[in-house]
């Protein structure tokens, strides 16, 4: 029992610091070799604000460059798989599944990515990368029609598995929500 308060302090200090920075402030890749292999899932979302003309084209004849949503879906899947090549301290993982969904709203293309693995660390970065690459691809596909498209609201919506437990983003409350 004498070690319990010390262990709790250590756990709290670990939760309240950046794990990718060592004591001297240098970047490092976290050692996950002692973590349990568990099934982990993450879902992220984002939006690409586009002009009414782009919405009209996406709902109708399509944009001049081709099938924007199908291209963005494949790009998002590829992005999830390439995350450790793009994010320097991200661990290479055995990604076991990626789903990227795109929908056309009244003012935006809405993107959701779900990534799954059975590994030692989570797939939040893979889900965020999938959304981001899909969003960039939407912009590439519509730029001939709308040069002012904007990527917004890229965020983790939920995660499960692992030591830190489950997370689900809650909607903000209040009149401006």
From Swiss-Prot:
Species annotation: Streptomyces griseus subsp. griseus (strain JCM 4626 / CBS 651.72 / NBRC 13350 / KCC S-0626 / ISP 5235)
Catalyzed reactions: (8S)-3',8-cyclo-7,8-dihydroguanosine 5'-triphosphate = cyclic pyranopterin phosphate + diphosphate
Pfam families (alphabetical): MoaC (PF01967)
Gene3D superfamilies hit by this protein: Molybdopterin cofactor biosynthesis C (MoaC) domain (3.30.70.640)
One function term, GO molecular function aspect: cyclic pyranopterin monophosphate synthase activity
Coiled coil location: none
Top EC category: lyase
NCBIfam families (UniProt xref): moaC (TIGR00581), PRK09364.1 (NF006870)
Gene Ontology terms describing biological process: Mo-molybdopterin cofactor biosynthetic process
Pathway: Cofactor biosynthesis; molybdopterin biosynthesis
Superkingdom of origin organism: Bacteria
InterPro entries: MoaC, MoaC_bact/euk, MoaC_sf, MoCo_biosynth_MoaA/MoaC, Mopterin_CF_biosynth-C_dom
Assembly: Homohexamer; trimer of dimers.
Protein's UniProt name: Cyclic pyranopterin monophosphate synthase
Keyword Lyase attached: yes
EC number: 4.6.1.17
Described purpose of this protein according to its UniProt entry: Catalyzes the conversion of (8S)-3',8-cyclo-7,8-dihydroguanosine 5'-triphosphate to cyclic pyranopterin monophosphate (cPMP).
Catalytic site: 140
Amino acids binding substrate: 89-91, 125-126
Family according to the record: Belongs to the MoaC family.
UniProt keyword list: Lyase, Molybdenum cofactor biosynthesis
């Amino acid at each position: 029992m004498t070690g319990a308060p010390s262990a709790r302090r250590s756990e709290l200090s670990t939760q309240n610091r950046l794990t990718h920075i060592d004591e001297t402030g240098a970047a490092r890749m976290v050692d996950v070799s002692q973590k349990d292999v568990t099934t982990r899932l993450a879902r992220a979302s984002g939006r690409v604000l586009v002009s009414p003309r782009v919405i009209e084209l996406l709902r109708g004849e399509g944009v001049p460059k081709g099938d924007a949503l199908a291209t963005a879906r494949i790009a998002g899947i590829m992005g999830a798989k390439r995350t450790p090549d793009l994010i320097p301290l991200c661990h290479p993982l055995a990604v076991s599944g990626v789903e990227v969904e795109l929908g056309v709203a009244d003012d935006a293309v809405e993107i959701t990515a779900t990534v799954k693995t059975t590994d030692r660390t989570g797939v939040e970065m893979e889900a965020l990368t999938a959304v981001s690459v899909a969003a960039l691809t939407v912009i590439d596909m519509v730029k001939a029609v709308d040069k002012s498209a904007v990527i917004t609201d890229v965020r983790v919506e939920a995660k499960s598995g692992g030591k830190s437990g489950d997370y689900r983003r809650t909607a903000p409350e209040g009149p401006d929500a």
